[in-house]
């Protein structure tokens, strides 16, 4: 069933501009309080100018362009400007450091980068020291360094016409994005997302929260994440609603922003809910128009009840991952909700619990959560240049193995139990234990290392490192944490260190992580 009518993203934006014209499409608020507003007509024109900018820089259909940006209008311009000319966006987590960013550049084959002055020194170093295909950098800031191969994004964009100059043939099967996501291996994998995936995500996520064109969808989620793109932005635009993109989350500012923009829908992760709850009570706590708060794992029933009672909101649970594009299991609009269930499978999806032999399990039995969709349409197409990893999780008939455990009840409600092996959920970010262990193992004083997630009252899980030192060595906490801060993104740095004489292992020599939690 083709529910998108064969429409790729270029056609979507041309139609939205015609239908909604001067209606507000996008509002962006920077950390400094600067607010930019665009109507559907104006936003489509900015997208066209950006597409023309890329064309003048030699970008053609199939080329990859990396974005290393915080939440800003330029991210939206680039995302859809690239899609209009058949080029491919490669968003990079804005919190990654040099080594991690360089690896994504190398493995995505990106030939152009759009970033800000904040991140430029890192990429200048990457160009000098790492082998990449990067040939040009566009900076979104006004002031430019006197370097070759660097241009002003804004200056070049504003020189372009508002009508599209290059419009190659497009198909909904064309790749629109490669989104690198942390996995249980030491390196992230590039999730290939098509035009169809994004168009479907818009319709599906709009259905999930019964979105209308008079709604205002506000998010503080980072634009480089799938939930901001597919649960929020694509849903809002597909419904002709207003999308509000806030640059950075602030617990003190959040409710003021919800009230200021008269938001009717927003999305939260547990870290946000917990930090909002520790703010001083205010008479304005319930002075808002929110009817739904899209919510992603994991919260206790007491936390949920306290939050909903204090702020007068409803949580609409949604379960998914980058590979599923949207929240494929979740609460439905107008349907009953059964906490702590994560909901039921949405339309166009089947869901099962399977055992270790890939056999379906009956209600009440615990196993792996598996999802059936259509690759390249309702679930991701593949991992970029990684057929082995693709085959490991995606069956030929469209069944996707999530690696998460859970069970379902007799009425089809699913319940999540635990995260996939070796993953830590920290304040909305997925962190691979293996990746951290490989980095920490390079410290000259460390003989053995294991990293685990432990419960954290604010950020879901904190990261704890257990290390065995080389004989005769000593290691202070200060030295250890300084080493980590210099070699990994801040959100990956462990919070705790424990030095041990040995680590628990099973008979095959594998570390028994559960004994350390």
From Swiss-Prot:
It is an enzyme of class 6 (ligase). Its EC number is 6.2.1.48. One of its GO terms (biological process) is fatty acid metabolic process. Pfam families: AMP-binding, AMP-binding_C. It catalyses: 4-(trimethylamino)butanoate + ATP + CoA = 4-(trimethylamino)butanoyl-CoA + AMP + diphosphate; crotonobetaine + ATP + CoA = crotonobetainyl-CoA + AMP + diphosphate; (R)-carnitine + ATP + CoA = (R)-carnitinyl-CoA + AMP + diphosphate. Keywords: Ligase. The keyword Ligase applies. Signal peptide: none annotated. GO terms for molecular function: carnitine-CoA ligase activity; crotonobetaine-CoA ligase activity; medium-chain fatty acid-CoA ligase activity. The keyword Ligase applies. Pathway: Amine and polyamine metabolism; carnitine metabolism. Belongs to the ATP-dependent AMP-binding enzyme family. Catalyzes the transfer of CoA to carnitine, generating the initial carnitinyl-CoA needed for the CaiB reaction cycle. Also has activity toward crotonobetaine and gamma-butyrobetaine. This is Crotonobetaine/carnitine--CoA ligase.
């Amino acid at each position: 069933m083709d529910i998108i009518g064969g429409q790729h993203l270029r056609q979507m934006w041309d139609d939205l501009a015609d239908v909604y014209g001067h209606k507000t499409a996008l509002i962006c608020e920077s950390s400094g309080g600067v607010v930019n507003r665009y109507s559907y007509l104006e936003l489509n024109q900015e997208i066209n100018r950006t597409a023309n900018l890329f064309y003048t820089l030699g970008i053609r259909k199939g080329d990859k362009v990396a974005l290393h940006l915080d939440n800003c209008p330029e991210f939206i311009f680039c995302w859809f400007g690239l899609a209009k000319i058949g080029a491919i966006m490669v968003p990079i987590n804005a919190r990654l450091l040099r080594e991690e960013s360089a690896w994504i550049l190398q493995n995505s084959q990106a030939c152009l980068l759009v970033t800000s002055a904040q991140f430029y020194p890192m990429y200048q170093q990457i160009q000098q020291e790492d082998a990449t295909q990067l040939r040009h950098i566009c900076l979104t800031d006004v002031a430019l360094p006197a370097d070759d191969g660097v241009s002003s994004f804004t200056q070049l964009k504003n020189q372009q016409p508002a009508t599209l100059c290059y419009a190659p043939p497009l198909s909904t099967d064309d790749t629109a994005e490669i989104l690198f996501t942390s996995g249980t291996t030491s390196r992230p994998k590039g999730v290939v997302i098509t035009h169809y995936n994004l168009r479907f995500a818009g319709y599906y996520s709009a259905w999930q929260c019964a979105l209308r064109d008079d709604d205002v969808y506000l998010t503080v989620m980072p634009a480089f994440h799938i939930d901001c793109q597919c649960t929020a932005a694509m849903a809002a635009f597909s419904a002709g609603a207003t999308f509000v993109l806030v640059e950075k989350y602030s617990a003190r500012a959040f409710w003021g922003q919800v009230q200021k923009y008269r938001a009717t829908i927003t999305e939260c992760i547990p870290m946000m809910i917990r930090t909002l709850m520790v703010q001083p009570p205010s008479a304005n706590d319930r002075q808002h128009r929110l009817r739904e708060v899209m919510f992603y794992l994991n919260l206790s029933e007491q936390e949920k009840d306290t939050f909903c009672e204090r702020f007068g909101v409803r949580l609409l649970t949604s379960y998914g991952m980058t590979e599923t594009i949207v929240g494929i299991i979740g609460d439905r609009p107008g349907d009953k909700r059964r906490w702590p269930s994560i909901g039921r499978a949405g339309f166009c999806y089947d869901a099962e619990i399977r055992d270790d032999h890939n056999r379906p399990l009956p209600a009440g039995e615990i196993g792996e959560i598996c999802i059936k969709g259509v690759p390249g349409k309702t679930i991701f197409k593949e991992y970029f240049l990684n057929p082995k990893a693709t085959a490991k999780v995606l069956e030929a008939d469209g069944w996707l193995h999530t690696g998460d455990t859970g069970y379902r009840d007799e009425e089809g409600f699913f319940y999540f139990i635990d995260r996939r092996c070796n993953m830590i959920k920290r304040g909305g970010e997925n962190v691979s234990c293996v990746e951290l262990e490989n980095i920490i193992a390079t410290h000259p004083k460390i003989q053995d290392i294991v990293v685990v997630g432990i419960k954290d009252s604010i950020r879901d899980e904190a990261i704890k490192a257990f290390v065995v030192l080389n004989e005769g060595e000593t290691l202070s906490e200060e030295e250890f944490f300084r080493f980590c801060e210099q070699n990994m993104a801040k959100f990956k740095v462990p919070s705790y260190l424990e030095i041990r004489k040995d680590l628990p292992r099973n008979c095959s020599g594998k570390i028994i992580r559960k004994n350390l939690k």
